[in-house]
């Protein structure tokens, strides 16, 4: 069975439709997106900022049978930058408490 390594800063609780709970504690290793401003200029009075994104803490794809959990922003940026993301997932269908705070997710999703 495959294992999941949580590369986010928060512990993650997955609650399936059947009520089964799976806890994915943060691994202490974080994969995140960083942004660099490359230039700022104007077009017809509108400020334009050219930016580039970078991924810090990319997991070693050679780890056999390992699956990784990152944020949606990180997953989408990795895909856009051409990283292989077959073994990288993000929380989906968030669960919220009465005050609207995210307390878990119903599933993990990946980009295919």
Where are these regions (language model features)?
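Intrinsically disordered, low-complexity segments enriched in small/polar residues
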Residues: 2-13, 18-112
């Amino acid at each position: 069975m495959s294992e999941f390594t949580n590369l986010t800063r928060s512990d993650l609780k997955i609650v399936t439709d059947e009520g089964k709970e799976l806890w994915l504690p943060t691994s202490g290793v974080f994969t995140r997106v960083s942004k660099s401003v490359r230039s700022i200029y104007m077009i017809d009075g509108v400020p334009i900022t050219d930016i580039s994104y970078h991924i810090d803490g990319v997991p070693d794809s050679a780890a056999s049978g390992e699956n990784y959990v990152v944020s949606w922003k990180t997953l989408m940026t990795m895909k856009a930058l051409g990283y292989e993301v077959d073994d990288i997932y993000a929380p989906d269908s968030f669960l919220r408490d009465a005050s609207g705070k995210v307390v878990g997710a119903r599933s993990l999703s990946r980009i295919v």
